[in-house]
Amino acid sequence: MMKTILGERAEICFAMKANPFLIGPLKDTADKFEVCSPGEFHICETVGIPMERIVLSGVNKEKCDITHAMHTYGNAGVYTIESRKHLELLEMCAKEENITIHALIRVTSGNQFGIDEEEAFNIVSKKNDYPHVRIEGIQCYSGTQKKKFSKIEKELHWLDDILTRLKETCDYDAEVLEYGPGFYIPYFE
């Protein structure tokens, strides 16, 4: 249903933290799986989700976790950039593996997830300092259980503004926008 509404260019990325028990039934439905912990990553490996369909997100990744993914799967998958320090860790690991990885800058909508706009612009303006990390776009998770579409619409305008300013100020064309809108799910109705 979502693909019908959003069109064929849109991909559905299931956030495993929502319910890791759904990964089996969604294996052939979701285009990608957002994985935020080593445990979630292990579940994906066990179930046989190809790395090409995994977005390694969140700050709960240590060097050994990143190195394992890169050493085992090369440059498959997408990594999120949670901070400049995290970007430097991704660059170091990718350089050690002699690969160039795909990454998205995780921008915050004011919650605890991601980096602020100013830092995102600084990272994009210095993207050539990180030759082993190909920044393909931005990611934003803005919360959950939103009942009003007007809030989602406002966030989409805000993200569009960021992408427009990145083009104007940094001559950067984002290829990917990953947006977690936090649709309302009536669990108890």
Model regions: which residues?
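An N-cap/entry alpha-helix motif that binds or orients negatively charged groups
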Residues: 1-7
